[in-house]
């Protein structure tokens, strides 16, 4: 399975970066300001008595955040630093935070807007935490940041307009410290930084192919180039494309996935080390701690530790590994009896599962023998160990891992996906029977936790006097209403770039949308009519 590849000599010449209309993004001088940018002295909205609706000091931590709002007219997005709005986007704009994948920190944000004088009728700019423009570019650009290198990607232009569905365009790499553009090989449309190497996916459209026709041999017309920052190429793979390892990319920062076409409908997935040249075929996925799984020639599966010198084999399986946490692997088997199994790496015991669900830090497994367990993904510690009393003729289950050892279960005794019983379990066993909520709410979703770590939920119900409208109630772990009548509410994942405090969610109440705590206090809010492009359309946010 292991192959060591021949590396291209350092004397090879790479193509120079072309800052032209067809294959690059021309840097423009900084603009004078951001249209629609908020003043540093933004006023806090007040209630009828003149009392501020929120204390801006609560979120005054200097971190970039983004508040998304949606309504019938489309989307509107606000970029904030701490609790200070920097920019409220028009509906024709695209704005987003730019996270450095190496640090997980976002110190910049990107904005693109309509401009008839720009390439494809669009322009793009990068801004810092103060709202000051750092760089601007022709065209509609997407951006990623990797170890201080800004990677820009632009869709293909045809007759002055973008054709994003073609899947190929151009890319550019800029060193933010110096503003210098790094060499990019001809045909490059994406770039991934692996260690000190740049991995480019490239494509050449066949001559004579109509601009709007699909390239039926696109797999054969792609290739991958790995090169040094100075442009020296060190490796090339034909009929291939490269993909960053999005999960556990810090531990395996020198590795990249290569998909190499071996036939008209067959592809080899390869885990490639840009520093050593090692290649492992049959690659499936990576797991925490630098582990990876592979398929073998005899139809089995291997789990290997890619951080060790010999890439040590941990275990071999008959079924495909789905998830890993210390001491265990979740496997998936297909066919008529498809489903999950919990594999004990120490004993080799396999336990059939009804369902499995993972949060950022825990993984919950509900076994067909009735046992319900929640483990820590960090160390494999057992957080919850209880037994579920099944409903009569139980056929399936819907499970939601609420974190901290809590699990929401919907038990079904039919094949129509109708729920028979709804229960909440935790470290102490059964917490509450919430079956009665089924008659009141069209659906109930996990929202956040209360200050004691117990889960809270958001239930959607019909608004009084409305045939189609809905309102939302916030419920505690016992199903009691804590907040009612919200126009919207939605949770945030703990790994969100917004980095909000605990026990906070996005909500709309009345004519304001923003972030609220479980006591109903705003941490930040803005009028749903505050955007110049809102057209007086009600919105909801997250």
Enumerate the predicted regions with their spans.
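Bacterial N-terminal signal peptides that target proteins for export
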Residues: 2-13
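C-terminal motif of bacterial Sec signal peptides marking the signal peptidase cleavage site
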Residues: 20-24
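Bacterial lipoprotein signal-peptidase II cleavage site
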Residues: 26-34
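Residue-level detector of conserved, function-critical positions
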Residues: 33-542
């Amino acid at each position: 399975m292991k192959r060591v590849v021949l590396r291209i000599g350092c004397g090879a010449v790479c193509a120079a970066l072309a800052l032209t209309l067809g294959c690059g993004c021309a840097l423009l001088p900084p603009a004078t300001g951001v249209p629609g940018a908020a003043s540093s002295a933004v006023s806090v909205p007040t209630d009828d008595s003149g009392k501020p609706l929120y204390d801006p000091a609560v979120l005054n931590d200097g971190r970039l955040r983004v508040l998304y709002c949606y309504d019938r007219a489309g989307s509107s997005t606000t970029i904030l630093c701490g609790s200070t709005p920097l920019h409220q986007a028009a509906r024709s704009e695209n704005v987003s935070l730019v996270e450095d994948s190496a640090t997980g920190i976002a110190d910049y944000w990107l904005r693109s807007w309509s401009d008839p004088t720009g390439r494809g009728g669009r322009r793009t700019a990068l801004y810092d935490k103060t709202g000051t423009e750092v760089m601007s570019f022709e065209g509609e650009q997407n951006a990623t940041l990797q170890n201080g290198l800004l990677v820009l990607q632009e869709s293909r232009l045809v007759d002055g307009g973008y054709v994003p569905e073609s899947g190929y365009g151009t890319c550019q790499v800029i060193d933010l410290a110096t503003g210098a553009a790094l060499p990019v090989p001809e045909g490059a449309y994406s770039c991934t930084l692996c260690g000190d190497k740049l991995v480019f996916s490239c494509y050449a459209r066949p001559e004579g192919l109509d601009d709007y026709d699909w390239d039926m041999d696109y797999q054969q017309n792609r290739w991958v180039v790995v090169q040094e920052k100075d442009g020296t190429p060190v490796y090339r793979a034909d009929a291939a494309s490269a993909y960053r390892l999005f999960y556990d990319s810090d531990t395996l920062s020198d590795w990249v996935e290569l998909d190499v076409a071996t036939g008209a409908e067959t592809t080899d997935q390869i885990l490639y080390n840009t520093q050593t040249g090692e290649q492992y075929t049959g690659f499936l996925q990576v797991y925490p701690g630098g582990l990876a799984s592979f398929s073998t020639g005899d139809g089995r599966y291997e789990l290997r530790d890619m951080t060790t010198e010999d890439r040590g084999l941990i275990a071999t399986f008959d079924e495909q590994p789905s998830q890993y946490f210390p001491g265990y692997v979740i496997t998936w088997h297909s066919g008529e009896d498809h489903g999950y199994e919990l594999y004990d790496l120490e004993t080799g015991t396999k336990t059939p599962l009804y369902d499995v669900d993972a949060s950022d830090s825990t993984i919950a497994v509900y076994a067909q023998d009735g046992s319900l367990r929640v483990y820590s993904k960090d160390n494999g510690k057992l957080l919850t160990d209880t037994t579920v009393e099944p409903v009569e003729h139980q056929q399936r289950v819907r499970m939601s891992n609420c974190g901290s050892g809590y699990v929401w279960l919907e038990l079904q005794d039919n094949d129509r996906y109708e729920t028979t019983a709804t229960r909440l379990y935790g470290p102490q066993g059964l917490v509450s029977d919430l079956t009665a909520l089924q008659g009141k709410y069209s659906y109930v979703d996990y929202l956040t936790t209360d200050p004691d770590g117990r889960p809270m939920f958001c239930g959607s119900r019909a608004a009084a006097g409305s045939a189609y409208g809905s309102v939302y109630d916030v419920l505690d772990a016992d199903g009691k209403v804590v907040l009612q009548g919200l126009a919207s509410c939605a949770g945030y994942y703990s790994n969100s770039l917004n980095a909000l405090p605990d026990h906070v969610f996005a909500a709309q109440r009345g004519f304001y949308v923003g972030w609220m705590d479980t006591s109903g206090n705003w941490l930040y809010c803005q009028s749903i009519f505050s955007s110049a492009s809102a057209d007086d359309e009600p919105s909801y946010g997250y």
